[in-house]
């Protein structure tokens, strides 16, 4: 590990010099490329430099303890040695995590798709609860959200809702949300007070850039129709809604939320591009993914990942056995404790497989 860290630090210093070179400064695309590469190394280089300082002080303290010291000074040195040893171990663990292969999608924006599953109207209402939970979480993170497409039900739920989350590290934090979310509660339409169980499916896709997925316009069939609102009522007399079919894969995306046909087409293409990227990555990783199923789950949309129990105010993530009795705050977007636990478990599993 030491040799690898020294090499990373050397390259980091090279990039620092390049970024101050007048020729590089004059070439913006080249400067941005180097700046991005250096930014990706900053955390590991800072940790390594701090680690080197700690090791140096540790050796000095160990040397002191080999000398004859008065009892009070010796006690202070022993205490410092203990603290430095603990700090060294923490930094070693941190560096091991930072050296893990990075998911190339981690810095991408996210397209989230939430679909009502079993449970009819109650599942559709819960889809709305999850949509609000994720938009609130995004707000807490300082990210931007944009509605891309929605299919409403008569009582204000969603059969399906698709939205974009833009922000630094959005995919790295939200990727473990893919799967089946189960809700247990008494529906507002239930007169007998019985608890019903409903499900909603969440898919988290990294937003694909045009360079990630090349779409041949000849492979697309584009249909235009009138958009409709809850209950099938027409909300727009002009034909602004767009349905795009990618003929080779049979992937279909519809968008009708904008009054402009052009904007609906742009949004539909963003979703289509993300789905095609996911499809390509799944095909490429299929064999590897089946061999390396981490404790945090498969990311499969059919996997039941979490239960939200309203009568008990409880949220349980089944992949890591985490139960929290603060459902209200979680639905208000306070997801950090859940998401950080999932990330930590994933890192631990990957460290184990790298060992």
Swiss-Prot record:
SUPFAM superfamilies: Release factor. SMART domains: PCRF (SM00937). This is Peptide chain release factor 1. The modification N5-methylglutamine is found at residue 233. It is found in: Cytoplasm. Pfam families: PCRF (PF03462), RF-1 (PF00472). Gene3D superfamilies: 3.30.160.20, 3.30.70.1660, 6.10.140.1950. The lineage of its organism: Bacteria, Bacillati, Bacillota, Clostridia, Eubacteriales. GO terms for molecular function: translation release factor activity, codon specific. Keywords: Cytoplasm, Methylation, Protein biosynthesis. GO terms for cellular component: cytoplasm. It comes from Desulfitobacterium hafniense (strain DSM 10664 / DCB-2). Belongs to the prokaryotic/mitochondrial release factor family. It comes from the Bacteria. Methylated by PrmC. Methylation increases the termination efficiency of RF1. Peptide chain release factor 1 directs the termination of translation in response to the peptide chain termination codons UAG and UAA. NCBIfam families: prfA, PRK00591.1.
């Amino acid at each position: 590990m030491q040799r690898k860290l020294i090499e990373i630090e050397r390259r980091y210093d090279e990039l620092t010099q390049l970024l101050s070179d007048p020729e590089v400064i004059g070439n913006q695309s080249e400067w941005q490329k180097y700046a991005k590469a250096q930014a990706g190394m900053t955390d590991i280089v800072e940790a390594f430099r701090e680690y080197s300082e700690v090791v140096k002080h540790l050796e000095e303290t160990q040397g002191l303890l080999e000398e004859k010291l008065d009892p009070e000074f010796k006690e202070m040195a022993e205490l410092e040695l203990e603290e430095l040893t603990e700090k060294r171990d923490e930094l070693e663990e941190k560096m091991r995590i930072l050296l893990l292969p990075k998911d190339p999608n981690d810095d991408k924006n996210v397209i989230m798709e939430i679909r009502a599953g079993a449970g009819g109207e109650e599942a559709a209402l819960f889809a709305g609860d999850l949509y609000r939970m994720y938009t609130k979480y995004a707000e807490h993170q300082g990210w931007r959200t944009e509605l891309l497409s929605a299919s409403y039900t008569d009582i204000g739920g969603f059969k399906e809702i698709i939205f974009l989350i833009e922000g630094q590290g959005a995919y790295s934090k939200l990727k473990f949300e893919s799967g089946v979310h189960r809700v247990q509660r008494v529906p507002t339409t239930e007169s007998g007070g019985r608890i019903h169980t409903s499900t909603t499916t969440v898919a988290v896709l990294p937003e694909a850039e045009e360079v990630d997925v090349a779409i041949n316009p000849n492979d697309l069939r584009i249909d235009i129709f009138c958009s409709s609102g809850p209950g099938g009522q027409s909300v727009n007399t002009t034909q602004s809604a767009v349905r795009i079919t990618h003929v080779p894969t049979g992937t279909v995306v519809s968008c009708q939320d904008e009054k402009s046909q052009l904007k609906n087409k742009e949004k539909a293409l963003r979703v289509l591009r993300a789905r095609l990227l996911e499809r390509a990555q799944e095909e490429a990783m299929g064999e590897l993914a089946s061999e390396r199923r981490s404790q945090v789950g498969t990311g499969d949309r059919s996997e039941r990942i979490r239960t939200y129990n309203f009568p008990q105010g409880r949220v349980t993530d089944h992949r890591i056995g985490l139960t929290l009795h603060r459902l209200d705050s979680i639905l208000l977007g306070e997801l950090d404790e859940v998401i950080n636990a999932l990330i930590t478990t994933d890192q631990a599993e990957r460290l184990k497989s790298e060992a």
